[in-house]
Amino acid sequence: MERGSLLKAKAGGKLHGGNHGIAPEEVVAAQRARMSVGMIEAAAQKGYAAVTVADVLERAGVSRMTFYQHFANKEACFLAAYDMAVEIVMTRIGAALAAESPALERIDGALDAYFSTLAQEPEVAKVFLVEVYAAGTAVLQRRLATQAGFVDAFAGALGASLPDQRVVAEAVIGAVVALATNRIVAGDFGALPGLREPLMSALITKLVRQDPAGS
């Protein structure tokens, strides 16, 4: 798969002036998607703090009036961009966790999907795990909720329902995120897929031994 292809697919084609031949709500959705992609690209390249609304307009090919019809400010646009980044990453993880296979195989597939998606989509990765910290309280709260969702998904896949098991699941997800973030900050995207195997070992020793059904 081409690097960055998942993000490019979200942008779609540019709409030109006049009659688009599509429903108004589809035009609105397409404009919002292009601005979200534009924010992801700009934040990944410049850092969120340095991004201006003009940067997003240039990449999305929309007017300033259109921008403010969708978003109150830059932070609101970034929140939509972050949600898009989450969707790109979680779609592949969700498919792996929903597979009809033993717990360990589903967890292995989810980790593979997580690291391979971040490696394939470097701009998404930067927004998802790095620039999110610079974008304000509302976005940070969304990021914490996203990580809690990861913990729920992993704990659920392994049947980790006891409080102590939940803490271990939280620690494992914390390690996954921290290791990925360190590589992304360093620009070492190629190293991301190689993190899966050692983390699987940690999952085996910390979680699966507490869940006979998953062994």
Question: Which ranges hold each PLM region?
Answer:
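Alpha-helical structural segments
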Residues: 30-41, 45, 59, 76-96, ...
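Amphipathic C-terminal alpha-helical segment
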Residues: 117, 173-190, 202-214
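Amphipathic alpha-helical segments used for helix-helix packing
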Residues: 118-137, 181
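Helix-turn-helix
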Residues: 42-76
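Secondary-structure edge/capping motif, primarily at the C-terminal ends of alpha-helices
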Residues: 93-96, 100, 128-132, 183-187
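Short, hydrophobic secondary-structure boundary micro-motifs
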Residues: 52, 126-129, 192, 215
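N-terminal intrinsically disordered/low-complexity leader segments
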Residues: 1-30, 158, 211-215
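Amphipathic alpha-helical packing segments from all-alpha helical-bundle domains
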Residues: 136-171, 178, 193-201
